[in-house]
Amino acid sequence: NANADTDRAAQPFKTTAEKTGIHILSVVSGGMRCFTCKGHEIRVPADANGLTFRVMDSPIYIKMVEALSANAVPMAGSEMYVAMQNGVVDGHENTIPNILQDKTYEVQNWICMDEHIPSTSAVYSNEAL
């Protein structure tokens, strides 16, 4: 990632290493997050109005869904499939790799490829390694 190669992007990594001894070796892409839904096609933001989405228990994800005039239900990922299967929530937002891994496509029939948030992971190491 070209952005991660700049001094400005590297500074938080250096600060973390200095304060904690934990070195961030790499940041990798986990894909872009998209909305899925059962029985409701989402093409424009207004299509999400009144729907209920499972989200991670994170204020930014909750506010994002609420900004669509939809309802956010913070829920563990392990509960997501059954919640969608039983109609507790209309859908969720996740990356394509996670949608495939969790097989949520079995209980969802629409995906909105809006790519609203990039999902990243980091590789860490302590100084001993």
What are these regions (language model features)?
Residues 1, 11, 15-129:
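N-terminal secretory/targeting leader peptides
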